[in-house]
Amino acid sequence: MKILFAVSECTPFVKSGGLADVAGALPKALARLGNEVAVMLPKYSQIPEPWKKRMKKQAECTVAVGWRQQYCGIEHMAENDVNYYFIDNEYYFNRDSLYGHYDDGERFAFFSRAVLEAAKVVNVQADIVHTHDWHTAMVNYLLKEEYRKHPFYERMKSVLTIHNLQFQGIFPPDVTHDLLGLEMDHFHYERLECNGFVNFMKAGIIAADHVTTVSPTYRNEIMTPYYGEQLEQVLQYREDDVTGILNGIDDTFYQPKSDPYIEAQYDSGDLACKLENKTKLQQRMGLPEKNDIPLISMVTRLTKQKGLDLVRRIMHELLEEQDIQLVVLGTGEREFEDYFRYAEFAFHEKCRAYIGFDEPLAHQIYAGSDMFLMPSKFEPCGLGQLIALQYGAIPIVRETGGLYDTVRAYQEEEGTGNGFTFSAFNAHDLKFTIERALSFYCQQDVWKSIVKTAMNADYSWGKSAKEYQRIFEQVTRSGRDVLE
């Protein structure tokens, strides 16, 4: 099967969030299943020079953005049995950040059409075009409404994966004609219109032959008003064509047995080496070197979505009452950055905050932590808890989205489970759950059993890739056009 990924970011080239991890790992996993896989993404200025030097110019064309014709260069490189095509346009992609610009609607209207035009130019006649989030959701719509009428595209099917429904690509009505080049009758509640605006995510949802989300629980949650971000009725209409598939992690990159970033490699049969990583982390962060003190960590975007309101309400009291250490790595909203700076000042012997992102340090934190805190308000899938499980840092999470699907609460009677969970989004329950985890940490035989259970499970992309393969095969067998 020929599969074309259309993504706005992709590791190892450029990353702002978890979407890049999926776009980096899933194509490789599908290629290992015998598929012919290509990935198209913008050639951002942020891509490191060593990667740019490996790119070879393949072709160029022009792409319509409304009434204008814009240059589109197509550069190519192959890596891990995947063909990568980089869409080059200095005006749109030579910016100081990937997103957050006044003309993001224009940038990704261009990119969406460029994907389809470039596919023909370089002869990537895919069976499946797999798009991700609002940035490429318009590819699904343009394919259905316009390109499918041409022989090259007539057999192409499309799948949209929703990574985070909160971000939808919402723009003024004139985007319909001025940027997308579509007649204004497309600006209609059964098509692009949502609450008086053009909504790229909605366009993808209604036009894709199938929609996936990044966990089964998140799939069910977004059908409800609380999580549906005003698109729950659209999703309910497509309910039979929406599937939740858990993300995996790249277990060659996140692998404690061979991780070059950590002090001592280890596995579930050699947990003494995990303690070496804990000592090294304490040294690096300037914390007292005490192996018997539980070290709790967070590697996260510092935002309300990640449950940091709850953390802020209980952390002062917890650090005063408990003999623990806390290490935080991340950037985000100023109020939370300032809070963790304050916490480090107020509890200098117990707390350290690295405001920024450092990939080697992230690995060292996973390897050196005893527990990993992730009390998200909502979490479509979450990669942090999967990496933590892989490294034997036991997750403490709220039961939502992919956290509910991947972290099983420890049951003392049966001796089962790989973490600690709570349901209601409130600070009291979070504090109680942390205290419960701390009580089991004191029982070292029990704790080692929990750690081994966590580390011995398979969090790779193998199983998930097979589920995507099944969806793709199902879609290609179907002759139904969802917009008919």
Curated annotation (Swiss-Prot):
Keyword Thylakoid attached: no
Keyword Nuclease recorded: no
GO terms of biological process kind: glycogen biosynthetic process
Record-listed ADP-alpha-D-glucose binding positions: 15
Enzyme Commission number(s) from the entry: 2.4.1.21
Domain of life: Bacteria
Keywords: Glycogen biosynthesis, Glycosyltransferase, Transferase
GO MF assignments: alpha-1,4-glucan glucosyltransferase (ADP-glucose donor) activity; alpha-1,4-glucan glucosyltransferase (UDP-glucose donor) activity
Disulfide bond sites: none
Family matches, as CDD domains: GT5_Glycogen_synthase_DULL1-like
Induction, as annotated: Expressed exclusively on media containing carbon sources that allow efficient sporulation.
Reaction(s) this enzyme catalyzes, per UniProt: [(1->4)-alpha-D-glucosyl](n) + ADP-alpha-D-glucose = [(1->4)-alpha-D-glucosyl](n+1) + ADP + H(+)
UniProt pathway: Glycan biosynthesis; glycogen biosynthesis
NCBIfam families, A to Z: glgA (TIGR02095), PRK00654.1-1 (NF001898), PRK00654.1-2 (NF001899)
Function of the protein: Synthesizes alpha-1,4-glucan chains using ADP-glucose.
Family classification: Belongs to the glycosyltransferase 1 family. Bacterial/plant glycogen synthase subfamily.
Name of the protein this chain belongs to: Glycogen synthase
Annotated source species: Bacillus subtilis (strain 168)
Source lineage: Bacteria, Bacillati, Bacillota, Bacilli, Bacillales
This protein's encoding gene: glgA
